[in-house]
Amino acid sequence: QWREIYDLSSVQGVLAQAWDGMQLLPEAMRPPRALRLQWAVNVERIEKVYRRQERAIARLAAFYREHAIPMMLLKGYGLSLFYPVPEHRPCGDIDIWLFGRQPEADKLVAREWGVPVDVHKEHHTTFDVDGIMVENHYDFVNKETHASNARLERLFKQYAAQPGESVAVAGVAVYLPSEQLNALFLLRHAAVHFAAINIGLRHVLD
């Protein structure tokens, strides 16, 4: 039974949250020691990846700040800050919004860091920072697939013009989306996952 819980929580992207919940149980109700050790090792791996991403975000935000470009975090890391243990919410790519200054920012990254920027994506460009993929959004959704996306995009950009709170990531200030933008964008993102692949428990928790 515990092995099934472990495997399922891993597939659903909530392995570290399940670990946190397991700590609340009496010793007699916890899984066997061998499984706990395996679990702990993988939670530690999640934490290390989170710290790497945190450093990459801080480096990127500091670089943009030198050029007077504000940066907003979308999904991932920004959402983790709402969790009881932020570093236990796994983050994939770093999704950013630069308030319409994406083309300028990409040229700066390519010129000053020598980092190749992939422009052949649907609604963002991509590049690598310290081994972590960055998605630099010029649109929030792919406007070419559905007419409704174009209407949504106008709404996303309207909300994005007024960012939410500013938080410090390793001492560097970044913006988070407003509550309105977060709610709409996350629901849209989850709907796309549900239609194209599936929707995991991590999306529900977000």
Predicted regions and their residues:
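Conserved NTP-donor binding/palm subdomain of two-metal-ion nucleotidyltransferases/polymerases, i.e.
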Residues: Q1-G92, L98-D206
